[in-house]
Amino acid sequence: MYVNDEGILTSEFTLTDRHQGPPGHAHGGASAAILDEVMGLVVWAAGHKVLAANININYRKPLPLHQPLLAEARITEVAERKIISEGKIILPDSTVAVEGSGVYVIASRFFEKAIMNGANS
């Protein structure tokens, strides 16, 4: 995973049999989890401590198992207490298979309190 100079986070991955939904293809929940992860991570990489408030996923094509796939995410809006990001999963032929957007709320106090109470240690 890396974030380029334009703020786009990119991650290459391959789904396996344990991610299967329909025969030979990924379960939709696996796709949603991947997009939630990259859409949230691009916000964290920009220095914001956030929690997901809403994610929206649009399935365009099924994701094949055992093939290299690409996930990308970028921040599209920064407001006072919320940040919106968008993500997509791209097939080997460059077709966008799954798209999503996420609304993340800034929750710095939540994380500061958790750290002071010994969480994540």
Regions found by a protein language model. Give the residues of each.
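Conserved positions in beta-strands of structured domains
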Residues: Y2, N58-R60, E72-T76, I90
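A conserved, well-ordered hydrophobic junction motif at loop->secondary-structure transitions
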Residues: T10-I34
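Hydrophobic core residues within well-ordered beta-strands of beta-rich domains
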Residues: G7-L9, L51, L69, I83, ...
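HotDog/MaoC-like acyl-thioester-processing domains
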Residues: L63-L65, T76-S121
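Non-catalytic linker/capping segments at the edges of enzyme domains
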Residues: M1-E12, T16-D17, N120-S121
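Hydrophobic residues in beta-strands and at strand termini
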Residues: F13-L15, Y59, I106
